[in-house]
Amino acid sequence: MKKIIYFGLSVLSLFLLIACSKGEEKSSQENQTSQPQQQATVKQIAVGAEAPDFTLQSMDGKEVKLSDFKGKKVYLKFWASWCGPCKKSMPELMELAAKEDRGFEILSVIAPGLQGEKTVDQFPKWFEEQGYKDIPVLYDTKGNTFQAYQIRSIPTEFLIDSNGKIAKIQLGAISNADAEAAFAQMD
C-alpha cells in the first residue's frame, strides 16, 4: 500500500513540475516578444550616438541645456556625493576644470534626493565643505537625465564631441591625461 501511495505522489509531483515549467517557458517567451518593443522606445547610448539633450538647473540656479554647448566638446560626469570613487576623482577633476585653455566644457550631474543623494538644499553646503570648486554641478531632480544616459554605475563619464556625438563612455573615473588625449583626437 505504501508503494502505491509513494508512486502516486511521485507521478503527481512530476506532473506538477512539468506543468509549472511550461508556464515559465510561456511567460519567458511572452517577455522575449514584448521586450524588443520596450527597447525600441529607449534610445541606445553608445559611442557615435547623439548625446541626449537635457535641460537641468545648475547649483547656482541657472538653466543649462546640453544643446547650448553645440559646437563645443563636453566632458559630462554623472556622480553622487556618497560615492567613494566619485569623491576620490574630484580633486583631479578640479585641476582639469581650473585650466582655462583645456578646449572643452565640463558638466557634472547629480540626482538630488534620489537613491541616497543629498537634497537640493543640502548639497551646496556639502559641496563647499568638501572644498570643491570650478566644477559646474547640474541637478537631475527627477532622474530623467540619468535614465536617458542609461546610468547603471557611478561615476560614469561621457566625452562628447563638438557635433554632439558621444566619443567615449567611461565607467569609473577617467584620468585627466586620458580625457585630454581623447579630446585632442576629436574633430
List where the protein language model places each region:
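Loop/turn elements at helix/coil->beta-strand transitions in domains of secreted/extracellular proteins
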Residues: 71-74, 102-105, 133-135, 162-165
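Thiol-/selenol-based redox modules, centered on thioredoxin-like
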Residues: 37, 159-187
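A short beta-strand-turn-helix
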Residues: 45-48, 53-74, 98
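Short active-site neighborhood of thiol/selenol oxidoreductases, capturing the structured segment around
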Residues: 64-87, 106-107
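Conserved helix-turn-beta segment immediately C-terminal to the redox Cys motif
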Residues: 72-73, 88-111, 128, 176, ...
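Thiol-based oxidoreductase modules, predominantly thioredoxin-like and allied folds used
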Residues: 104-118, 134-142
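Short, internal strand/loop/helix patches
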Residues: 122-160
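N-terminal targeting signals for export/organelle localization
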Residues: 1-51, 187
